[in-house]
């Protein structure tokens, strides 16, 4: 997953000013950092000829769970967080971290396909809302697509 993420990320974002290409080590560090909170049902990749061409990566929104931790995140609260996420399913909202499609597949329905795949699965999931992270104003296609789903 980390390598597929890196390949799409580098093709989709590294061409923008101020964005550096991601190396393998950095991609693996990011995924390892996210691993404890990842719900695999919230990660979607699109492929063409076995090559990754897009992704939508979401995580459970931790804010409602960690609010009672009062800013402390020692071992006890880490255990409480894992229990809340993995056993009690206390996180009822999803946070969309990143969505991307490689430039050569823009305008070919990949974005809509990924959203549609998620839309079909969401009723089966224990979440009731989705918050999307920032969408750059340089990406009018994504802005229009998100506006049509809201």
Residue ranges and their predicted role:
Residues 1-100:
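A conserved beta-strand-loop-helix scaffold within acyl/acetyltransferase catalytic domains
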Residues 92-95, 122-136:
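Conserved GNAT acetyl-CoA-binding A-motif
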Residues 93-101, 106-122, 148:
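Conserved acetyl-CoA-binding loop-helix of GNAT-fold acetyltransferases
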Residues 73-86, 113-122, 132:
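Low-complexity, glycine/alanine/valine/leucine- and proline-rich hydrophobic stretches
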């Amino acid at each position: 997953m980390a390598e597929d993420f890196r390949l799409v990320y580098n093709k989709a974002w590294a061409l923008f000013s101020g964005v550096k290409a991601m190396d393998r080590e950095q991609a693996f560090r990011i995924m390892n950092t996210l691993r404890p909170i990842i719900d695999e049902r919230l990660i979607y990749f699109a492929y063409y000829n076995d090559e990754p061409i897009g992704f939508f990566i979401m995580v459970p929104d931790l804010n409602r769970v960690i609010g009672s931790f009062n800013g402390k995140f020692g071992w006890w609260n880490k255990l409480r967080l894992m229990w809340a996420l993995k056993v009690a399913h206390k996180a009822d909202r999803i946070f969309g971290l990143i969505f991307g499609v490689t430039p050569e597949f823009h305008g070919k329905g990949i974005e809509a396909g990924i959203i549609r795949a998620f839309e079909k699965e969401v009723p089966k999931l224990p979440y009731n809302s989705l918050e999307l992270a920032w969408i750059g104003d340089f990406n009018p296609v994504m802005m229009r697509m998100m506006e049509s789903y809201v």
